[in-house]
């Protein structure tokens, strides 16, 4: 664990923009989260705001309130939101300067780097704190090109993909990793986004900050490193998906199957979402789940189960979609946030047996 942390949300904690904050509130091995800064939900428990489950993480209106209530500044202040284009908004920049002035190191997952802001860097140097831009790419000489070494990895790979972005793929992947471990399956998770790193996953890379020529190689390197460095070695390696195979604003997922060697897929879907996120004005509709499963099969992977995101649905509506899809597809369909993913463990166990025999 790196230390204690305060998560800054710029008044967006109760929105989908705060998925980094949501992930850290749900669980992280990298930080001990002491609080969230978010004006609209101040005074409440962050877990209760997120999903109704109290986690003992208070929400403060300001950084000043947080430091005063906690008695001392946490070690880190984390940007907990995603912005349009990954830009550092004036509000977030001001909050980072305030956090630095209070004595906190800052952690930023946006595409715009705090370390390249002269005023922010000078302020951090003066206060003796650090700036971590999680999405800042490694030097080209340190990046890896795909070599085929992943083909020698003995643990089957299972990718958690989605029919769109911002569906909860990472959360489902973590839930599944934990459920497998509880059931005695040695499972590891390869992160592919900034939140996965912030949650403390040991192996992975930030996919959208790597030049395209090296994405497959960085994925392979993470998988091979996980296989070689784990003791005992994993029985299953989960791969966190990004975006969706057919999202025109940023298609992703085929790398996990073709370059990562994933022969199994868990497919996350939001039944109430008709169009790709942010593209409704262009009438760019999300393909049906059955059609997506057929495409996944063309890539050479088998969809083991479907997991559902409940956005904009009542409990009754979500259950109805669950029953309908299970009947149409003939595979398990589960609601991770509502019922967990333990029902998928037998399916995963059979997948491991089948792939190990193969």
Role assignments for model-derived ranges:
Residues 1-76, 80, 84-87, 139-159, ...:
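Flexible phosphate-sensing "switch/lid" loops adjacent to ATP/NTP-binding sites
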